[in-house]
Amino acid sequence: MRTLWIMAVLLLGVEGSVIELGKMVFQETGKNPVKNYGLYGCNCGVGKRGKPVDATDSCCFVHRCCYKKVTGCDPKKDRYSYSWENKAIVCGEKNPPCLKQVCECDKAVAICLRENLGTYDKKHRVTMKFLCKAPESC
């Protein structure tokens, strides 16, 4: 089942260390990250760029900008460690500096998505790229 979930995430193109990011989003929001955020708005998912459609989509925009600041590793592929302690994400102490940055980016987007659950709109669950307005710069 885990392999099937990973394949689904890869096919939809969710950025970040797929397993960790997906777990964080689920832990913080209680939502399936692939179904609910894989194609959401103009910034959630790979290859999507554009003016955010709402606060939820803005979380993904900020996440993309956070990844642009990471140097020394591939935030889309390299894995890191983290734990879920007392309903809070804790990035692993033994992560190298680059992966600590990636973990913090992923933690921030997961928390942002939780904090903006009230702005989540099912009509934006599948937004086609051509409908997005010119992207904003970080």
Swiss-Prot record:
Molecular functions (GO terms): calcium ion binding; calcium-dependent phospholipase A2 activity; phospholipid binding; toxin activity
GO biological process: arachidonate secretion; lipid catabolic process; phospholipid metabolic process
Location in or out of the cell: Secreted
Tissue: Expressed by the venom gland.
Keywords: Disulfide bond, Myotoxin, Secreted, Signal, Toxin
Record-marked site positions (Hydrophobic membrane-disruption site (MDiS)): M128, L131
Entry similarity comment: Belongs to the phospholipase A2 family. Group II subfamily. R49 sub-subfamily.
Additional facts recorded: Negative results: fails to induce platelet aggregation, and has little effect on the ADP-induced platelet aggregation. Does not show hemorrhagic activity.
Known partners and oligomeric status: Homodimer; non-covalently linked.
Protein name: Basic phospholipase A2 homolog promutoxin
Organism: Protobothrops mucrosquamatus
